């Protein structure tokens, strides 16, 4: 979650400070942010069933 927040803040700073011609960097950061978010969701999706097997209710 910390990485997600850092990437969002960096994207906002770049969006405010760069010219439209430099928007490629923002696009790259946005793609990295989406990839990290999807990986985190997949990790949580995999961890929950394993956690339920180890620690039954």
UniProtKB/Swiss-Prot annotation:
Keywords: Antibiotic, Antimicrobial, Immunity, Innate immunity, Secreted, Signal
Biological source species: Drosophila sechellia
Protein name: Andropin
Residues in the signal sequence: 1-23
One Pfam family matching this protein: Cecropin
Keyword Secreted listed: yes
Gene: Anp
Induction field: In response to mating.
Family named by the database record: Belongs to the andropin family.
GO-annotated cellular components: extracellular region
Tissues showing expression: Ejaculatory duct of adult males.
Function field: Male-specific peptide with moderate activity against Gram-positive bacteria.
Protein location: Secreted
GO biological process, one term: innate immune response
């Amino acid at each position: 979650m910390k990485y997600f927040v850092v990437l969002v803040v960096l994207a906002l700073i770049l969006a405010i400070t760069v010219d439209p011609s430099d928007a490629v960097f923002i696009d790259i950061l946005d793609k990295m942010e989406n990839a990290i978010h999807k990986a985190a969701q997949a990790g949580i999706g995999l961890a929950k069933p394993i956690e339920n097997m180890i620690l039954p209710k």
